[in-house]
């Protein structure tokens, strides 16, 4: 009697092969799909990282898209000079030249009636004169004592260019814009044959309750910390040091049961601002127990240790730390390349393919 398979048995074998093939294909597909969650306190640079992904992995911002950011550039510039002028009153700093008091009054009038996306030569002239004033500069140097955008000096130092009638924001201008992220912003791009879905989540406390919806199936978390926040307080709670808030948040994310198998990538961001600030503002403002020198290398290494020491599962979980400057495209490109290699390795392990 021959050992032939019945039609039914053949169909069963084919079905089994198809299931195996589908499982393998699903595994490979899962290994190629990366869900990245960008977390961190407010103003830590998350949205700037997302903008860099568009510049690096897509085709950047078109001229039309850049034009749309003109409104934000002008708004950020005007709000920055207004924040400094208001702080002068609180900090009891006088203008270097008495005539600037008239300019300050004029600023509020012109800013209140300014057409969106337009900077008149009159308004630009008022802002330039104010920004050059010794009292305004003295107040700017004390910006840790009030809330001020990181991009303030970038725009205010370049008023001649950005106030031109034919001005179109550059990619760098776009990177420097600040708009508070509310809700969840999703970005898709392909890199090293991986399909990335990146989720930027609002960092202010009021936004955090929305994060939970993103947690399922996350491949990796990029947690952003602004190194330069060590001597600042929160916009939403002026009693809370920003770095302490970041540490508290990192602790809750790094040791969360949801993320037992999730790669944690720590971006210690704004290293350029930190390098400047540490020369004049001691790290002991944030860490009174710190006894090291106020050099970039030593102070940055100390902050890195403070965060990495929060990981309570060091034996099974690694935190991958990178020092970043989110406005520097080359730096972000280099770091993201290294991050992707870690993700590929860990992703393949998860799918049993490594």
Curated annotation (Swiss-Prot):
Residues 173-181 are annotated as: G2 motif. Keywords: Cell cycle, Cell division, Cell membrane, Cytoplasm, Cytoskeleton, GTP-binding, Lipoprotein, Magnesium, Membrane, Metal-binding, Myristate, Nucleotide-binding, Palmitate, Transducer. Gene3D superfamilies: GI Alpha 1, domain 2-like, P-loop containing nucleotide triphosphate hydrolases. Residues 196-205 are annotated as: G3 motif. Heterotrimeric G proteins are composed of 3 units; alpha, beta and gamma. The alpha subunit contains the guanine nucleotide binding site. GTP binding causes dissociation of the heterotrimer, liberating the individual subunits so that they can interact with downstream effector proteins. Forms a complex with CCDC88A/GIV and EGFR which leads to enhanced EGFR signaling and triggering of cell migration; ligand stimulation is required for recruitment of GNAI3 to the complex. Interacts (inactive GDP-bound form) with CCDC88A/GIV (via GBA motif); the interaction leads to activation of GNAI3. Residues 35-48 are annotated as: G1 motif. This is Guanine nucleotide-binding protein G(i) subunit alpha-3. A lipid is attached at residue 3 (S-palmitoyl cysteine). A lipid is attached at residue 2 (N-myristoyl glycine). It comes from Mus musculus. PROSITE patterns: G_ALPHA. Belongs to the G-alpha family. G(i/o/t/z) subfamily. Transmembrane segments: none annotated.
């Amino acid at each position: 009697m021959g050992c032939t398979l019945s039609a039914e048995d053949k169909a069963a074998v084919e079905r089994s092969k198809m299931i195996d093939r589908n499982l393998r294909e699903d595994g490979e597909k899962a290994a190629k799909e990366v869900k990245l969650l960008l977390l961190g306190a407010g103003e830590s640079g998350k949205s700037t990282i997302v903008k860099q992904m568009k510049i690096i992995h897509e085709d950047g911002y078109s001229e039309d898209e850049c034009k749309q950011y003109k409104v934000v550039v002008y708004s950020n510039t005007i709000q920055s000079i207004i924040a400094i002028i208001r702080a002068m009153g609180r900090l009891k700093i006088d203008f270097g030249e008495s005539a600037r008091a008239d300019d300050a009054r004029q600023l509020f009038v012109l800013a209140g009636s300014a057409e969106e996306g337009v900077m008149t030569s009159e308004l630009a002239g008022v802002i330039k004169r104010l920004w050059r004033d010794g009292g305004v500069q003295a107040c700017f140097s004390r910006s840790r004592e009030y809330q001020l955008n990181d991009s303030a000096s970038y725009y205010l130092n370049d008023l001649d260019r950005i106030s031109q009638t034919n001005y179109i924001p550059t990619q760098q201008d776009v990177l420097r814009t600040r708009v508070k992220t509310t809700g969840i912003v999703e970005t898709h791009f392909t890199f090293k044959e991986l399909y990335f879905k990146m989720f930027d989540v609002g960092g202010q406390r009021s936004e955090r309750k929305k994060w939970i919806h993103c947690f399922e199936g996350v491949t990796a978390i990029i947690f952003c910390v602004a190194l330069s926040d060590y001597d600042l307080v929160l916009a939403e709670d002026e009693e809370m040091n920003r770095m302490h808030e970041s540490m508290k948040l990192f602790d809750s994310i790094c040791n969360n049961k949801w993320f037992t198998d999730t790669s944690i990538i720590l971006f210690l961001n704004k290293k350029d601002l930190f390098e400047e600030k540490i020369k004049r503002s001691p790290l002991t403002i944030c860490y009174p127990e710190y006894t090291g020198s106020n050099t970039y290398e030593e102070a940055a290494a100390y902050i890195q240790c403070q965060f990495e020491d929060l990981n309570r599962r060091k034996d099974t979980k690694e935190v991958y730390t990178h020092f970043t400057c989110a406005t520097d495209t080359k730096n972000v490109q280099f770091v993201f390349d290294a991050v992707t290699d870690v993700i590929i390795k860990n992703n393949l392990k998860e799918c049993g393919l490594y």
